[in-house]
Every structure is written in C-alpha cells, then in structure tokens.
C-alpha cells in the first residue's frame, strides 16, 4: 500500500512536469508570433464605394485591399475637433511611416464645400504625403452611409432627416485590415488611451500574414 502511494506521487509529479514542459514548449514556439497575441476582433466590413481623392483620381474599396488603413471623417474648415484629430493622426502616421502597406484614409463630411481642389490645398497646407494619406470626397449620402454602416463611426439612427439637412461630425477612427475587415473597436481620436490602443492594434494587424 505504501508502495502504491509512492508510485502515485511519482506519477503525479511526472504528469505535472510533462504539462509544464508542454506549456513551456508552446510558449517559446509561439512567443513573439501572431499566434500568441490576441487578435483585434472583426466588428464590420468595408462596403463597396467609389470616391475621388485630392488629385481627382477614383478611389474605391479595392484600394483598401492589401493595405492596413486607419479611417477618419473630417472637414477642411473645421476649427473645433478636427485640428486635434489630424494632429493625433499625424503622430500615428509618423509611427508607422516605415510600414509600406500602411495608409490613412480621411473622408470629408462636408463634400458641398470640400471639393477635390480644396482637399488638395488642405493636403498641401498640412504637408501630407498623399500617396499614403488619402483625402476623399464624393456624394454626401454615400460618405455618410460608409461612416455609419461600414466603419461604425456614427450612429445610423442619426439618419432621420433628409441628407441635405444632416451634418455628421465624428471624432472616431476605424482600423481596417488588408482584407477589408474593420477590426478592434471604434477608437476615440481625442483620447490618449484609445490612441495608444489603436497603435497597438495597428501593429498587431500589420504583423498578420
């Protein structure tokens, strides 16, 4: 009987040691890889769209594929939250400038004023690299629909009046992966904790293969 107890203890110790070794093996195998990290959740999908960029060139949902994009909505004459939002966006752009497949896609929420020419002037004044920080204009209803139903940056319930009477003003950013999936969460472009979280999620999505 005493011998059985000793054997059971040895067996238990062997099992514990084996379990620890297996856990350790997989930790070192996947440590630092995308498999070990938690992935930002899929919360929506980019829908088909067709807008014009600051150079008058067509930009569609296909231009999002193969890129990791941060999306925002702003307008060039904004004196309130937009300057701070775009200042924070500039910081994000600088941090990921070395990633060739990273881009910022900024839509106007005031297309009646923000023509292609005005977006170009704004880009020049901000010294934006428009190869990877794209400014878009288009039909107001299409822009607002993308913000609300694809990127989740504004409440669809706000779509209650005629489009001419609506004016969307949102401080939130969205993260889109290479396959057109909206990832992570809706990030507040004015709050540092959200910006820090966004930067971490950008890196996680960039690391995905």
Stretches found by the model and what they are:
Residues 61-89:
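Short active-site neighborhood of thiol/selenol oxidoreductases, capturing the structured segment around
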């Amino acid at each position: 009987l005493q011998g059985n107890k000793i054997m059971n203890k040895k067996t238990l110790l062997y099992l514990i040691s084996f379990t620890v070794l297996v856990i350790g093996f997989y930790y070192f195998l996947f440590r630092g890889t995308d498999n070990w990290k938690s992935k930002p959740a899929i919360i929506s999908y980019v829908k088909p769209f067709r807008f014009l960029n600051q150079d008058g060139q067509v930009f569609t949902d296909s231009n999002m594929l193969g890129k990791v994009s941060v999306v925002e909505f702003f307008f060039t004459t904004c004196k309130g939250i937009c300057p701070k939002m775009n200042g924070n966006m500039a910081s994000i752009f600088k941090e990921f400038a070395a990633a060739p497949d990273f881009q910022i896609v900024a839509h106007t929420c005031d297309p009646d004023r923000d023509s292609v020419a005005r977006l170009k002037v704004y880009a020049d004044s901000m010294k934006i690299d428009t190869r990877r920080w794209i400014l878009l204009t288009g039909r107001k209803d299409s822009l607002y629909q993308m913000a609300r139903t694809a990127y989740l940056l504004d409440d669809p319930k706000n779509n209650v009046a005629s489009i001419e009477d609506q004016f969307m003003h949102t401080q939130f950013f969205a993260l889109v992966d290479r396959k057109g999936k909206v990832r992570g969460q809706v990030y507040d472009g004015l709050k540092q904790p959200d910006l820090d979280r966004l930067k971490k999620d950008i890196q996680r999505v960039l690391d995905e293969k």
